[in-house]
Design a protein with these regions (language model features):
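Structural motif
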Residues: 2, 88, 110-112
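Glycine-rich phosphate-binding P-loop
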Residues: 2-26
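Conserved catalytic-core segment of NTP-binding enzymes
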Residues: 95-171
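C-terminal end of P-loop GTPase domains and the immediately downstream helical coupling element
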Residues: 169-189
Length: 189
């Protein structure tokens, strides 16, 4: 199973990715959550850990690490996704609907859409449909919110997650927990 975590920029995808990874690791019988960072934004797992310990140092390191999103990078990332063979693979992609993400996402099987702007969700849904990705969750990233909301769990998980901020442990949030259980369930089918 290869799940793309996608949506517009600055929605909190990397924060959600880290929270999901931690939540899944605590679930009994869960497969190892192999994460592919397929966007050169400088926010691998190291960034989340560094941001929790020293936010200023993490920002400085990210600025030094950040690279341009070239076609060559996208081709390499697409190969990582294509060749991923574990039971569960989570792919964190960049926040643009473009040919580079099309190349990377074309090797995935499922999608989780996270958006801080509800008006951008239909475009991401259409992009995923074009790539034959099964959308398993559509989540509104409510930065100003104070609580998660679960609207539906089937056939598509829908709701919101609040305050996705770098350096915050979001692994125990209700939306993260429900999504983690859903991903574990789907990966064992």
């Amino acid at each position: 199973m290869k799940v793309v975590l996608c949506g517009p920029p600055h929605s909190g995808k990397s924060c959600l990715r880290e929270g999901l990874k931690q939540a899944m690791r605590r679930l009994q019988g869960a497969p190892y959550p192999y994460v592919i960072t397929a966007c050169p934004d400088g926010e691998g797992a190291w960034f989340s850990e560094a941001a929790q310990q020293n936010p200023e140092l993490a920002r400085q390191l990210k600025a030094a690490y950040k690279a341009k999103f070239t076609l060559e990078f996208a081709q390499v990332a697409a190969q990582w996704v294509r060749d991923a063979s574990l039971a569960f693979n989570l792919v964190d992609v960049g926040g643009k609907i473009d040919e580079k993400n099309r190349l990377i996402m074309s090797h995935a099987t499922h999608a989780v859409i996270l958006a801080g702007d509800m008006n951008q969700i239909p475009a991401w849904q259409e992009f995923c449909f074009e790539l034959n990705l099964k959308i398993i969750a559509v989540i509104y990233s409510d930065y100003e919110g104070v609580a998660d909301q679960i609207q539906t769990e089937v056939p598509v998980l829908k709701g919101s997650i609040h305050y996705l901020e770098r350096g915050q442990d979001v692994s125990s949030r209700p939306m993260v927990q429900v999504l983690a259980r859903l991903l574990v369930s789907l990966s064992s089918v």
